[in-house]
């Protein structure tokens, strides 16, 4: 049995300024996105499409806005709609927490669609480019969850079961944040990076991301404690699982569409 070390959520104290671990994890995710993005630009089939480091920087800016706005609205709509309907001003208090990946994902899709319009590129060409780097941010975020001792797992008697003091029940639980770090972070990054090293039909890389994330998240939710204000829903599945199922189905549809539309590897064309 292990005990969560209860890290100080503030990593650096600079007088009145407090820099939190979770903020540093966001920063680490952005740095990895830019670093691996620059490596991706050098791949011959990517360089042939004219991607530049300026595009990468601009995509990060658009993506951050999409994550924040979409993540917050997703949490409001998917998890606590009645509460925020009664307290609408609370929606603005993002510093108090409350973000949803699935909402952030939709926000990024909209942001990349807008970016594509500005650059005269199809939105799926944009998402195909960024998909292999997204797991870097997911991995960093899950480490942030673990450091904060939040989003712990269900009770377990496995040797690596961990007591999370913030749970308040002294029960060993799955360190589900680390499961998600390993699955939707490390493993998904490896799969996508290897898959995207070769030219693929437009939409294929994005589709594989949807399938991979949805599958890893769906599986990890069996070890993760459901949100106490929601519990388990129909078929004893969590909200995270129900939101992941459409991602898996959409990913399968995108991959099938991509290969039927462009057999073999094909380069996408800019939109007019």
UniProtKB/Swiss-Prot annotation:
Gene Ontology biological-process entries: lipoprotein biosynthetic process
Class in the EC hierarchy, top level: transferase
Primary localization: membrane
InterPro entries recorded: Lgt
Subcellular location: Cell inner membrane
One Gene Ontology cellular component: plasma membrane
Keyword Repeat: no
Mode of membrane association: Multi-pass membrane protein
EC number(s) stated in the UniProt entry for this protein: 2.5.1.145
Record family assignment: Belongs to the Lgt family.
PANTHER family the record matches: PHOSPHATIDYLGLYCEROL--PROLIPOPROTEIN DIACYLGLYCERYL TRANSFERASE, PROLIPOPROTEIN DIACYLGLYCERYL TRANSFERASE
Main function: Catalyzes the transfer of the diacylglyceryl group from phosphatidylglycerol to the sulfhydryl group of the N-terminal cysteine of a prolipoprotein, the first step in the formation of mature lipoproteins.
Protein's name according to its UniProt entry: Phosphatidylglycerol--prolipoprotein diacylglyceryl transferase
